[in-house]
Amino acid sequence: MTTLPEITVQELQQRLAAGAALVDVREVDEYEQGHVPGARLIPLGELPGRVAEVPAGEQVLMICRSGARSAKAGEFLIGEGRDVVNVAGGTLAWIEAGFEVNTGNQP
């Protein structure tokens, strides 16, 4: 089993500013209630059928509510040949750090 690398929400903010891709694997209702600006929604249960939507050839950042589902998603995607990093603490840590969140269904 591969150890999934992790970054902090502070590192996430820096990487997003540099144009990194972020995938949120929570459910639609969770995403709509509040998500990191720019995060693309691909619910964990849909991920196996939507792997092609995850950018290849670049590192992709994964996020969920607390970091558990995104870690599972990351391990799966590593097996699919993707380069992924998990966001430690997830959206809860992002909000706790005082960063902006978007609501609704648009990234």
Model-identified regions with their sequence ranges:
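Short, surface-exposed ligand- or partner-binding patches at beta-edge/loop junctions that are enriched
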Residues: 63
